[in-house]
Amino acid sequence: MKNEMNIQFTALSQNESFARVTVAAFIAQLDPTMDELTEIKTVVSEAVTNAIIHGYENSGQGNVYISVTLEDHIVYLTIRDEGVGIPNLEEARQPLFTTKPELERSGMGFTIMENFMDDISIDSSPEMGTTIHLTKHLSKSKALCN
């Protein structure tokens, strides 16, 4: 059975934990393993932080949009902003690349997303924002119920 959730919140750093916990609570109905749940929470944290820090340049202006679809033990996750966009997506996806070294950003956000999820695609246009589509196939172990 297909199940969907959509949330929208102001692009403030303090809302990152709300996004992470909300997505994790929704996904918990599929009984993911602790590792799977931790990986998804980490990916949500990275993508939302990117939207807030880079997309909206930590201005507190704008919204972050998250949609989650669950179907047949597959998690489809979309995280979107309407911020400044990514001028060079190929460069941004390189490990350790950051546009904010003064904020001590590691430049590993996209690398983490790519390693923790089964599929990732990124659409971004200058001054139009960024949309990240992520997919994760969950095991069917019912690990959290045992």
UniProtKB/Swiss-Prot annotation:
Pfam families, alphabetized: HATPase_c_2
UniProt keyword list: ATP-binding, Kinase, Nucleotide-binding, Serine/threonine-protein kinase, Sporulation, Transferase
Record-level Gene Ontology MF annotations: ATP binding; protein serine kinase activity; protein serine/threonine kinase activity; sigma factor antagonist activity
Reaction catalysed by this enzyme: L-seryl-[protein] + ATP = O-phospho-L-seryl-[protein] + ADP + H(+); L-threonyl-[protein] + ATP = O-phospho-L-threonyl-[protein] + ADP + H(+)
GO biological process: asexual sporulation; negative regulation of sporulation resulting in formation of a cellular spore; sporulation resulting in formation of a cellular spore
The enzyme's E.C. designation: 2.7.11.1
Lipid biosynthesis as UniProt keyword: no
Keyword Transferase: yes
Gene3D superfamilies: Histidine kinase-like ATPase, C-terminal domain
SUPFAM superfamilies linked to this entry: ATPase domain of HSP90 chaperone/DNA topoisomerase II/histidine kinase
Function, as annotated: Binds to sigma F and blocks its ability to form an RNA polymerase holoenzyme (E-sigma F). Phosphorylates SpoIIAA on a serine residue. This phosphorylation may enable SpoIIAA to act as an anti-anti-sigma factor that counteracts SpoIIAB and thus releases sigma F from inhibition.
Family that this chain belongs to: Belongs to the anti-sigma-factor family.
The protein, known as: Anti-sigma F factor
Species of provenance: Bacillus licheniformis (strain ATCC 14580 / DSM 13 / JCM 2505 / CCUG 7422 / NBRC 12200 / NCIMB 9375 / NCTC 10341 / NRRL NRS-1264 / Gibson 46)
